[in-house]
Structures are given as structure tokens and as C-alpha cells.
């Protein structure tokens, strides 16, 4: 995330996403903490032996004094969301869309519908708009937004992006590429 708004609690100043991450990277470097990127943990034994692997070292073990599980998050797939229809190109998770725009410099679409009004969905609506996309709607299954009020104002209201609460995607049209979606209102009873 390249927008600002990070660091207020931790560093007592407003930072962009890269600046915020940079502060933590500097702390790790200053403290001499060993770290391994692109590494997968295969096993953690009861006596704290961590078996891991990566391309550089292959399979290896680390004897740990303590183990802290900080595994990040994994986005739910479209299948886990029970959205019917084909799986055409042009449908992305929020994390993939963020990576494409922020790191790869690639716009995933010109006309966008965002499902989910948590802070990531709201911020991506603004980001896609700033990059030239037309965000047609942000749809939210719940009768309220999961995002901060300030993000609703700064990311949707300031850009005239509509928010449809109690709505979800019930169909995806298109076989090769997404051609459209169908939204439906939900009533809380399923």
C-alpha cells in the first residue's frame, strides 16, 4: 500500500506503506535479527527444532529458543465465497490486485466492481480510480461496512464511488474474460 495513514500509533507520525515497512526493516537490521525470505516452514518439533526449506539452502533445521507464529493471512478463494459462474480472466483477489497495481505497475481492469468493504477494498477502490479505472460499485454482503469511517469518506465518498450494503455477487458472466457480474440484495436469511 503506497497511501499514507500508517505509523500513527507506532511511530507517532503518518507514513506511507513503504515508509512504514522501511522502519521495521531498519529495526530488524539494527538489532541484527536473522531472517529468511522466501522460506517455507515444514515442521516445528516439540523441542523447538524448525525444519524449513528455500531455494538457496534447500532443507535445513534451526534450533529455536522460542517460536512465534506470524504467518500473515491468506485470502479466501472465489470457491470459498460460493460465487457461481465460470472462472474467466479478470477476477482478482484484493491482494493480487494490490500487487499488480502497486508493485508490477499493471492495471487489472478499466471497469471494476469490488466485493467487500473492508479497508483493503475501500483503499483499492480509491487506488484503482486514481490509476484511471471506473469503479462501478463496492458491494458488501453485510448491512454495514467493515472499513473505517474515514476510509469510506476518503476512498468512496470523495470519488463518488457507490457502496451497496447487503449486496453480493451471485453470478459472473463470461467464459474467457469477465464480461459482467450480477449483484443481488441479501436479506440476512440467506
Segments from the language model and where they lie:
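Generic secondary-structure boundary/loop-capping signal
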Residues: 3, 8, 12, 78-80, ...
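Generic detector of intrinsically disordered, low-complexity, polar/charged segments
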Residues: 2-4, 14, 69, 76, ...
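FAD-binding core/adjacent interface of flavoenzyme oxidoreductases
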Residues: 20-111, 186-190
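Beta1-alpha1 glycine-rich phosphate/pyrophosphate-binding loop at the start
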Residues: 1-23, 27, 108-154, 162-164, ...
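A Rossmann-like FAD-binding core segment of flavoenzymes
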Residues: 28-54, 129-190
Amino acid at each position: 500500500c503506497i497511501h499514507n495513514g500508517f505509523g500513527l500509533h507506532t511511530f507517532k507520525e503518518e507514513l506511507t506503506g513503504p515508509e512504514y515497512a522501511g522502519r521495521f526493516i531498519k529495526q530488524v537490521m539494527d538489532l541484527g535479527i536473522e531472517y529468511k525470505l522466501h522460506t517455507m516452514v515444514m515442521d516445528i518439533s516439540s523441542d523447538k527444532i524448525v525444519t524449513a526449506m528455500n531455494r538457496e539452502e534447500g532443507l535445513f533445521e534451526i534450533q529455536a529458543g522460542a517460536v512465534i507464529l506470524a504467518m500473515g493471512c491468506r485470502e479466501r478463494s472465489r470457491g470459498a465465497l460460493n460465487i457461481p459462474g465460470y472462472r474467466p480472466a479478470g477476477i482478482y483477489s484484493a491482494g493480487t490486485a494490490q500487487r499488480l497495481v502497486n508493485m508490477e505497475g499493471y492495471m487489472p481492469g478499466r471497469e471494476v466492481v469490488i466485493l467487500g468493504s473492508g479497508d483493503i477494498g475501500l483503499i483499492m477502490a480509491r487506488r484503482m480510480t486514481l490509476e484511471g479505472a471506473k469503479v462501478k460499485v463496492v458491494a458488501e454482503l453485510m448491512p454495514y461496512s467493515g472499513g473505517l469511517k474515514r476510509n469510506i469518506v476518503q476512498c468512496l465518498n470523495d470519488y463518488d464511488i457507490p457502496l451497496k450494503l447487503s449486496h453480493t455477487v451471485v453470478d459472473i458472466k463470461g467464459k474467457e474474460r469477465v464480461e459482467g457480474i450480477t449483484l443481488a440484495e441479501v436479506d440476512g436469511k440467506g
